[in-house]
Amino acid sequence: MTLPDTAIMLAAGLGKRMRPITETMPKPLVKVSGKPLIDWGLDALAGAGVENTIVNVHYLADQLIDYLGNRSKPKIRISDERDLLLDSAGGIVNVLPQLGGKPFYVLNADTFWVGDEEKPNITALRDAWDDTHMDILLMTARLDQATGFEGKGDFVADVEGRLRRLRDVAGDPVTVSY
């Protein structure tokens, strides 16, 4: 089995929902409990044995590039997307050629990873990976375990654990935030 040793960290967003804080600072550098949001994910990745992380940048990119230059683990490569905001899927597709077809993690830079100290969430995700049976593995959280989330959720799980997308009252898919 091939475990992921590389991650993509999505950090290019405009941070509109956190304005005015993000008018002068990219959202991944906003501190939560004294620690920039991006470090929560990068530290979790390093703890799970991830060696390389590609971070895409766009909005206030120089600040992120300067900040990330001080990290040693995981090793950071920058995907500079200042010329065109690619959104999440575009940011992933843009760096796929660098990954050589191997499994990888994708994390949003504006989330923080907490969990059981004995088995952090990212480690649980890594340990659940089975490339002989999976093409993708998505970590979700029950609403009562989601930190700082007050919505109705994005998915429901059937009895076999398969996820189905929640729909709003009109039948349209709800916005995904994972």
What residue spans do the PLM features occupy?
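The conserved beta1-alpha1 loop
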Residues: 12
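Conserved catalytic-core motifs of eukaryotic protein kinase domains, centered on the activation segment
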Residues: 20-23
